[in-house]
Regions:
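Positively charged n-region of N-terminal signal peptides that target proteins for export
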Residues: 1-9
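Exported/periplasmic ABC-transporter solute-binding proteins
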Residues: 4, 21-281
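Alpha-helical transmembrane segments
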Residues: 11-15
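C-terminal motif of bacterial Sec signal peptides marking the signal peptidase cleavage site
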Residues: 16-20
Length: 281
């Protein structure tokens, strides 16, 4: 009798284990199939300064998620904010914080990272450091010649960004030069500013630190050189946020939400850092 009871218990144990394993296997299969079936496009639009970091995040995300594509339209911060508000993209990209009226219209911001705004000159320019006050005076047209700040006897050529640019907004806010700058040229992208300054020995401009190339020279501001570490510790004062903009009361699509969650997670920090900016997370 004891043998019969033992046999029954053993059979019941095996049956229970089989059912449990079958259930777990089915759940795993269902989860895998669900992940594989998720496909579509995540449309981002906005800041040209965010090209490097969004490009890096998009590439890494696509490598982990077959069937999902992340697109980027470099239209500038203002246009990206408008695009997400109008529903023509999933996520807007802004290199400035949202204004009160933009928040009031139903938009919300999530800070992705922090980026320095580099003050750039031609590599031939001997000037390597400027104070914040000198930068403001230069852009307001009060200092017109490089010799007045330790450079050559040559007229300063002021290069800036177009109205609506997040980089311009950040630069003018920090230097207190909003609507006061005497620009020679107002260009529509970070790349254009860098190219123009690289081609003119007397030019000065501002650009995302993450985008600065060896064709230009980033000067120190108040004795502090722009770098990831000085942006992170706050000693380099010319900096601004990189922001993801979404609609407050409108849920993202499943694929857009998955990308958003990835970009703002600790998992993405290494990718963000490799793009030359400081993760906010």
């Amino acid at each position: 009798m004891k043998k019969v009871i033992s046999l029954i218990i053993a059979v019941l144990f095996i049956a229970t284990a089989f059912v449990s394993c079958s259930k777990e296997s089915a759940e795993q299969t269902s989860s895998t199939e669900s992940s594989k079936s998720l496909s579509g496009t995540v449309a981002t639009d906005g800041s040209t300064s965010m090209q490097a970091v969004i490009g890096a995040l998009g590439e890494a995300f696509e490598a982990q998620n077959d069937g999902i594509t992340v697109t980027y339209n470099p239209t500038g911060s203002g246009s990206g904010i408008t695009a997400v508000g109008e529903g023509s993209c999933d996520i807007g990209l802004s290199s400035r914080s949202l204004k009160d009226e933009e928040k009031a219209s139903g938009l919300t911001e999530t800070v992705l990272a922090y980026d320095g705004i580099a003050i750039i000159v031609n590599p031939e320019n001997p000037v390597s450091n400027l104070t914040l006050d000198q930068i403001a005076s230069i852009y307001k047209g009060e200092i017109k010649n490089w010799k007045d700040v330790g450079g050559s006897d040559a007229e300063i050529v002021l290069i800036g960004r177009e109205a609506g640019s997040g980089t311009r907004d950040g630069f003018e806010s920090i230097t207190n030069t909003k609507d006061l700058c005497a620009y020679r040229q107002e260009l529509t992208s970070t790349g254009d500013v860098i190219t123009t300054v690289a081609g003119n020995p007397n030019a000065i401009g501002y650009a995302s630190l993450a985008s600065v190339k060896k064709t230009v020279k980033a000067v120190s501001v108040d004795g502090v050189s722009p770098s990831e570490s000085t942006v992170k510790d706050g000693s380099y004062v010319v900096q601004r946020p990189f922001v993801l903009v979404t609609k407050k009361d409108t849920p993202l699509s499943d694929v857009a939400q998955k990308f958003f969650d990835y970009a703002t997670s600790g998992e993405a920090n290494e990718i963000i850092t490799s793009a030359g900016v400081v993760p906010a997370n």
